[in-house]
Regions:
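N-terminal loops that bind phosphate or other acidic moieties
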Residues: 1-121
Length: 121
């Protein structure tokens, strides 16, 4: 695996299911849910997954969420760990297909669009 995808509830498993359906490349990621984990337990789970998988990149769902906070604590002592937060499907698709992390993040940014509908909706 190239990266860990972490988030609340079934976020990681769900978004990786979409990556698999579209590209067949979900095996490039390891999912992690924060469900039932304390902050310390979440950090321990991250450390174990990173150690076992060799992944050096973490994608998380929310900038101030527990998964991001745990990953950032680890990154303070591991300068090679890259944390990307606010992840969306286009970002993971680009990364799975071989883009480096910076290009994958840019793909996610470019994909985010406001499609105008009725005002006030």
């Amino acid at each position: 695996p190239r990266a860990v995808v972490a988030g609340h509830g079934d976020f990681a498993a769900g978004i990786l299911s979409a990556v698999q359906q579209i590209t067949g490349l979900a095996d490039r990621f390891v999912p992690l849910s924060n469900t039932g984990l304390s902050p310390a337990g979440l950090e321990d789970a991250f450390r174990q997954l990173l150690r076992e998988s060799g992944a050096r990149i973490v994608f998380t769902d929310l900038p101030a969420g527990s998964c991001t906070m745990a990953a950032r604590r680890i990154a303070k002592t591991d300068p090679e760990l890259v944390v990307v937060t606010g992840v969306a499907l286009p970002t993971l698709l680009a990364f799975a297909c071989g883009s480096d992390v910076s290009d994958a993040v840019e793909s996610g940014r470019k994909a985010l669009q406001l499609v105008e509908g009725p005002r006030g909706a």
